Amino acid sequence: MVFIDTARIYIKAGDGGNGFISFRREKYVPYGGPDGGDGGKGGDVIFIADPNLSTLLDFKYKRKYIAENGENGKSKNQYGKDGEDLYIKVPVGTTIINDETGEVIADLIKPYQKAIVLKGGKGGRGNAKFATPTLKTPRFAESGEKGREMWVRLELKLLADVGLVGFPNAGKSTLLASCSRARPKIANYPFTTLTPNLGVVEHKGKSFVMADIPGLIEGAHRGEGLGHDFLRHIERTKMLIHVVDVSGSEGRDPVEDFEKINEELRLYDERLVTLPQIVAANKMDLPEGKEKYPRFEEEIKKRGYEVYPISALTKEGLDALLDKTIEILSSIPAEKIEEVPEVIVYNPPEEEETLEVEVKGNTYYLKGSKIDKLLKRINLQDEHSLRYFEILLRKSGVIDALKEKGFKSGDVINVRDFEFEYYE
């Protein structure tokens, strides 16, 4: 299966259904009154962590996800049906990010954990809701609220106990294959591994998940080589096994290799160099490996790290390496995953309301997000709806703002080229 660990998708919550305008008309009921029902709520957009998924491949082919709209209200005070919620399945370990602001919306690290990212628009009220002792036959209803929309970025960070790090061709994939049933592509050239591989290691009655991270090079923290594409997969690991080609088969100095990789980890995220780390001096089956190992061991121990001479190819030294790995993992306190909320509810920041006023004679031209928001639920062509709009203008403080500019009763208000005289 193709491994995809990033995606950018468009999501939209469902629109609320419109309120309905109707009047009860039945024999022997001469004054039936309004009976228009409310519109249904739009569907939410909900992400759910599915343990059966391991890649974001599906989002390569489909990038727009829109929840169902609520149904319009009906006569006889019947409410419209709510829109179906839209569930989007992602692998466990997926981070959902607001693409515009970079804000982390949710981090789904527990199987079946949910994140309600966008809530559906509210249904509009039917005309029955607007009946008052002074307005017995309202001939208007509210339009449904539009569902919010946004672009989000999905980033998958693998959930593994142990991360294998090192230069390309150091032998990480061979080590993973020797320790587990994973079968990563193995060849004698750099960057054979282009995607992370996971394997379950079973050793002396214990088991853990090991991740083979594609080889790093100098500048990886800046995105060079495979860079940021895969460094993030180390973030969730509990410890690192630093695999070094101690034979220097690529013409590099093993000690310098060790230093450079740790520096890249530090530059990417300081926390990574604080993770428990042991060093696997690989390719001890080669004469050059045996020759260079004593100096390498001395230098690495000076830096405070434990070194284990191994051959990933012949499996020499693997028992001691895995014994130490299990010892370290057993000493790390288990994460309190039960404290992770089952459902995350995201509340996107509200857009700042704006009101623009242009005065020409006794006509006041209004525009801006504040007016747009009020108009979403108004039918300006209906007299009763227009009266309700005037009430909203007062309640929202727009009329007070106009009075500061000299507005008075009898002046004209213009919104979207529709004009009406306002009287108090």
UniProtKB/Swiss-Prot annotation:
Family, per entry: Belongs to the TRAFAC class OBG-HflX-like GTPase superfamily. OBG GTPase family.
InterPro entries named in the record: G_OBG, GTP-bd, GTP-bd_Obg/CgtA, GTP-bd_prot_GTP1/OBG_C_sf, GTP1-OBG_CS, GTP1_OBG_dom, GTP1_OBG_dom_sf, OBG_GTPase
Lineage, uppermost ranks: Bacteria, Bacillati, Bacillota, Clostridia, Thermoanaerobacterales
Bilayer-crossing regions: none
CDD domains: Obg
Binding site for Mg(2+): S173, T193
Primary localization: cytoplasm
Keywords, in A-Z order: Cytoplasm, GTP-binding, Hydrolase, Magnesium, Metal-binding, Nucleotide-binding
Residues of the OBG-type G domain: 160-330
Subunit field text: Monomer.
GO biological process: ribosome biogenesis
One GO molecular-function entry: GTP binding
Function summary: An essential GTPase which binds GTP, GDP and possibly (p)ppGpp with moderate affinity, with high nucleotide exchange rates and a fairly low GTP hydrolysis rate. Plays a role in control of the cell cycle, stress response, ribosome biogenesis and in those bacteria that undergo differentiation, in morphogenesis control.
OCT domain segment(s): 347-424
Top enzyme category: hydrolase
Cofactor(s) it depends on: Mg(2+)
Compartmental location: Cytoplasm
Protein residues bound to GTP: 166-173, 191-195, 212-215, 282-285, 311-313
HAMAP family: GTPase_Obg
Positions of the Obg domain: 1-159
Source superkingdom: Bacteria
Cleaved signal peptide residues: none
Annotated GO CC locations: cytoplasm
Enzyme Commission (EC) number: 3.6.5.-
Protein name: GTPase Obg
